[in-house]
Amino acid sequence: EILSGRTQDKNLSYLATWLNEIGIQLTEVRVIRDEEDEIVDTVNLLRKKYDYVFTTGGIGPTHDDITSESIAKAFNADLETNPQALAILKEYYKDSELTEARLKMTKIPKGAELVENPVSKAPGFKIENVFVMAGIPKIMQGMLEGAKIHLSGGKPMKSESIDVFMPESFIAEELSNL
């Protein structure tokens, strides 16, 4: 949806700011297609390269939400109904509302831990150093608090913007001395 231009990304800026506030510097960002092999290959590459990997999107109830299956494949783990996720959705939805599509959101790779979703209840999950969260910005933002207990960062990066009203080239030398 982002690659097609139909949806504008709102998660990246929020995630980068949030990570900086807890002392974790965002190093690389990728936007990839909803294609299993691409997700598997990308996750396998990045999880070895970085302390933490965050994915957003692809864990909902529709046919093209394939992130959970792809993450399971990346970790060579079975995708199974998580009893805790099922209990959460059973408590949140009436029986008539708990459709097969919604039950898809209870399928988590074996060995993964749930990441709480205080907004719409369907949880994300964490497996090793990979955090898998919803793509809807409000839901993803809520899930970050549940992920926070698994993260350790350094000192928060502080920054401040100032308006200078002159070309960058005029102050480039001074900036390089900072």
Predicted regions and their residues:
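Short glycine-/aliphatic-rich beta-strand segments at the starts of folded cytosolic domains
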Residues: 152-168
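Proline/glycine-rich low-complexity loops and linkers
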Residues: 38-41, 66-154
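N-terminal small/polar loop signature for handling phosphorylated ligands or for N-terminal nucleophile
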Residues: 16-66, 72-73
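Short amphipathic alpha-helix segments
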Residues: 166-178
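Glycine- and acidic-residue-enriched helix-capping/strand-helix junction motifs
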Residues: 2-12
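Short glycine-rich anion-binding loops that position phosphate/pyrophosphate groups of nucleotides
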Residues: 1-2, 58-61, 137-139
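Short glycine-rich or small-residue beta-strand-to-loop segments that form or flank ligand, phosphate
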Residues: 1, 52-57, 130-133
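Flexible, glycine/charged-enriched surface loops at secondary-structure junctions
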Residues: 28-29, 99, 156-161
